[in-house]
């Protein structure tokens, strides 16, 4: 009973109710104005047409554009305020300007290496084009001979993660969307507190919405008492505001500028299967060493400086030439490939995460294997997947067998028929929920990161990942994919057609609301 009451009176529920009341009151005022004044009603209809024309002219995915135009014209009292809140992908102009200042300052320390880019282009011009795109639009260079270790689940990664934290001598940076006290986080905090006593600079950054239900009130005070510096990205406020849209969905750990982790894993017990949620929780993480770690260091510092309104001494964190040399000496013997970390931001209107995926799809020749927890994609992504399958590429996607969000899962399933009809194989992960976000193709390239195949990840959130070419982690991702297929169920068109007419109609109708989910 106490647990139920805690959920009912949680910050998210109460804050959500306040926002719903504000939204409802706003809609009611609009409705009242249109009912009592024919002139206002006419002006409102004109406004809906003007807004629909504006949306149609915007540079955005056609699928989401269609959804918004339908909502604005068919349900203007709902669609217009909803578009104001959820339809605009960018942060406020003032926020963008502040972040641009920080970004330009730190990017000066991430100069690309022409030699590495030339070597990649000489080996594979197509891969070089991908790297060139990331260097130009994500702002982070490609590196050579970084050590990459892929982990197929949280419990495989966790012991090494703790050991790496214990080796820290200078600093530890952690940036996560979700953190929740329990076996995993408590053990990490214990190590961090000890490291603070040893003089290590420990910083922890978390998302205000992601942690609203998981972190106790004033948990940051608890951490600060232990000497751990904290920053919260966009704290939740129960107000109708566009800034609630843009979340920090990244997962980053950096240790002394020598070791970095990223992937789908947050800091909560389900990610290491110490707590059962939606069956077995399958995720993915990647450990990196070498010069490429600097990219993750700068990603962290960029957001940290913005939140706290400070200017870090980036030269302190940038490895010296001698340190770079020592890092290179430790690289695994079979690591001769290329690595390029990247971040995606809603500030620049450049969909880096999606374009990385589209580039991998378009360049696949033999196979393309994908892990994703959600499949809410636009026509561009659907067309790319289908074209690859029709061209003879073995295209396979794995989605959860047990979903975490029922409505979102209906939307995911609504994409099945078209893809299956056109040769794309779709598997549901029988043991439970798959939260990994991975692409791997042709034993040559792969990406592991935080980018879901849904509107929010592709358009609205701060995300990150690492693109790899001919590293040992590429083959490790492939091996994991093959094992996962064996544990999963391949969906057939006949199965989908057995669903009732009402269910299939409901799935189709949900597509109109995809941008809101």
Which sequence ranges carry the predicted segments?
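Thr-Gly-centered strand-to-loop micro-motif
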Residues: 371-372, 399, 429, 448-449
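Helical hairpin unit composed of two closely spaced alpha helices linked by a short loop
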Residues: 374-395, 400, 405
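Surface segments flanking catalytic/ligand-binding clefts of nucleic-acid enzymes
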Residues: 425
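Catalytic-core elements of nucleic-acid end-processing and repair enzymes
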Residues: 437
